[in-house]
Amino acid sequence: GTQDRLDYLIAERAKHRYMGLDTQIIGPEEIKKLSPITNVDGVLGGLYDPLDGHLDPSGTTHAYAKAARMAGAEIELRCPVLETNPRPDGTWDVVTERGTVHAEHIVNAAGLWAREVGAMAGVYLPLHPMEHQYLITEDIAEVYERDEELPHVMDPEGESYLRQERQGLCIGFYEQRCDPWAVDGTPWTFGHELLDNQLERISDSVEFAYRRFPILERAGVKTVINGPFTFAPDGNPLVGPVPGLRNYWSAVAVMAGFSQGGGVGLSLAEWMVEGEPSRDIFAMDVARFGNWITPAYTREKVRENYQRRF
């Protein structure tokens, strides 16, 4: 709803064109036509990506795993790593509950446990998990009676994002009253369970969302999801060779892990095999943070980055 925000989107469009993306700046009328459930009062314009969409996370993950196996990879499930010990020649012994694996290279892609796995090699990786909440609504006639799926909508003013979820809606928030999670470390026993809902934290964001998307007032809430994901202090992933350790690589703090995973994996593979990635990924280089960084600094900057997501 401000000229500054629109100017930012115009600058983003220029960046997208440089990268070969055909995004467009559109006005309120076009926004309303594409997303009839959006209240465009006070909206000056938006940035539209006609190729935007979403994938099934489970199916995509299994497709990656199948492709890896076809290329000769072996995947060991439920096999915790206990130690990572360097040898004088730069190779590594990875000690697991099922024995020790001798590896020329190792990659820390441990997600929520990246800090703990890094500590096994004496490395501090500056990242921190944050709690994040989103809502899934009951079925909505205005959604499932459409001939085509609703587009994703990101509302910077309301600090929210919305997309169609089957016959209802999914709406998530980057609230100001946010909380770091697992300050003392991610429990090894943490699995796929969710965290307790903290609806009071997102009450202001929900109230704004009901004005931006009035249809939500008539929609029942089917599920409230609260789960953790990781951020680096500047919001970018930590990718590449870890300074001071031979053949130890990082692919962590990938906040949008599912959507960024393919690009991070490709860049890291090129780096390991060819000696450098084919694209400039300086903004993701794990080496951009020096020895000066501390857990306290990381935690505060991660909170700030979450609050400024939009």
Feature roles, as predicted:
Residues 1-34, 157-161, 166-168:
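Dinucleotide-binding Rossmann-like beta1-alpha1 core, especially the glycine-rich loop
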Residues 67-70, 120, 271-275:
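Active-site catalytic microenvironments for nucleophilic, acid-base chemistry
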Residues 83-196, 204-212, 291-310:
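Flavin-dependent oxidoreductases
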Residues 4, 37-43, 85-93, 231-235, ...:
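A short, glycine/Asx- and small/polar-enriched loop/turn
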Residues 157, 166, 188-310:
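C-terminal catalytic lobe of FAD-dependent flavoproteins
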Residues 1-8, 47-70, 76, 193-203, ...:
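Short beta-strand to alpha-helix junction loop
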Residues 27-28, 77-79, 223:
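Short loop/edge segments at beta-strand edges and connector loops
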Residues 47-105, 113:
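Helical element adjacent to the flavin cofactor pocket in flavoenzyme catalytic cores
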